[in-house]
From Swiss-Prot:
Belongs to the NRAMP family. It is found in: Cell membrane. Its main location: membrane. Signal peptide: none annotated. Residues 62-85, 106-118 have a biased composition (Low complexity). This is Natural resistance-associated macrophage protein 2 homolog. GO terms for cellular component: contractile vacuolar membrane; plasma membrane. Keywords: Cell membrane, Glycoprotein, Manganese, Membrane, Symport, Transmembrane, Transmembrane helix, Transport. The gene is nramp2. Residues 173-182, 246-253, 308-326, 398-421, 490-491, 549-565 are extracellular.
Amino acid sequence: MNNNNNNKKLNKENLNEIENWNEIELTDYKKQGLDEGTSSNIYLFESNGNVVNGSIEDSPKQQQQQQQQQQQQQQQQQQQQQQQQNIISSDEEIEDKPFQDRDSNIGDGSDIDSSGDSIDIENTDYSILVPFEDEENNNGSKSKFSIKKLKSFLGPALFISVGYMDPGNWATDLEGGSRFGYQLMWVLLFSNIMALFLQTLVIKLALVTKNDLAQQCRKEYSKTVNIFLWLILELAIISTDLAEVIGTAIGLNILFGLPLIAGVAITSLDTLLFLAIQRWGIRKLELLILLLLSMITMCFVIELFLSKPIASEVFSGFVPRLNSDSVMVATGIVGATTMPHNLFLHGSVVKSRKIPNDRRKSVIKQAYRYNVIDTVLALNCAFFVNIAILMLAASVFWKSNIQVTELSEAYRLLTKLMDGKLAAVLFGLGLFLAGQSSTITGTMAGQIVMEGFIKLRIKPWLRRFITRLLAIIPAAIVIIVLGDKGTYTLLIISQVLLSIGLPFAVVPLIIFTSSYEIMGEFKNRLSIIIINSIIALFIIGLNLATIFQLINDFLHNDSIISKCLTIIFLIPLSIALCCLLLWLIISKINFFTNLLSKIFNNNNNNNNKNIINNNNNYSGNTINNQTIQ
């Protein structure tokens, strides 16, 4: 026990100098292994303000506190035993309850209207209970890697990988491959690495704070800023849904010959599909996603064998190079690969794996490790599909000097150029499956974003209907006015909009996970901060280049309408978005000042060490010289 504490009289004035005095003394008392009857001089601060110098056995209040602590420990042990009894195998860990049977709060959530159905996959009766042991076993060795535990964590990243191979990705990959060959493969690789870094930050934020990114934004920013962020993310989700509508319609056209406008109308019925699958448990939902993704992957494995790309040309595509003509397509690839709403969805689905409430460092580290493995496996699968699409376009279309401007045109060209209908049918089937799998995660992401930012909760089917309606209207107008070619242009624009919305998710994510006040000891290391800052600067720079190119193209267009829209709408909107992004950074200026001070302190410490070493060397040399003399 601390002697300084024992010699110090406590009173009301200096009580705050030593927080939780009795708790400190009890802890020391237990650490010394003293028996209950052993006398130990301590100071007890009574409720009346008197200080009593006595022993533990003479203090009824101390004995009462000790009994209460023992009772609490017994209750905790009973709860842990009960929790261990409830832990079952990974295939039986899911409480397969429907979405609408769940009614719990988001974050603090006491002020959220819980009437109506909600997609709250964090709730314990719709989650997976994962068994955990301490990072250090009794013999002091680290806990071993567990396949059974990994199986419990596999799944959340499947929802994220869906967004990395939706019809919007197909459009940008096909255009990139048919126009520039293998030249943009490095953009896909960099986008995948970038996505892995960002998704791991999302995992860390969710595990440490128990909040997804939208909930944390609501805590850190004002209501006005949150409303603007919500609107930007809603636009990104509608853009994603627009790609799903067009992709599904084209897939139906390829497989069954349905007119595009009829296919767009049919896509509105997928609300009924979501109403059906929302009654499933989360593991069955993950298995459905896995089945769809496996079928898409197999389609393109066969496509690659049929297209026979040249290996040397494939590897040359990983050398970074970019020109003014490919900037727009590269931006679309980045937006299609690293989708902003995925950063919000991932944090929420990660919380479906329930870990012990004590939030021990070892538990969080284990959960983080298994979630990262899940993410790496799922995103690399999505990366393979995207690379396969671009390689297919390069080896078939670019080699034949054909630029693809429509997805349906890609189907017809595959039939002609590859001497058979198998590749074309697989292409149409994969496109249809990609549209349907994206439908499932789109509604989940929209509900999470809406609840997280503005605490608004509506029924999932109503949310799905509104989002799909906002996507169907522009798709139908474009098909009627411009025909099939217009849908392809609309797909590219939707992916550019996704990329423009990405910084508004990435910047807060990096700031939050690098803050000690939010993350504690789990905050990002300096090297991770630098890497993610480079990623953010790359995204912002690419978006600025795209916006400038769009403004320049519209201003030099002969159409008066294009010039008016640019001056009245596009330029003010671009300025407003830049101002909002700056505000997200400036409002957290303490983070940047702390970061700079940390960098300078490290430099000063290194300089001081060098000075000390030089002085020591100089002193040593001086002594040696004197000795010689």
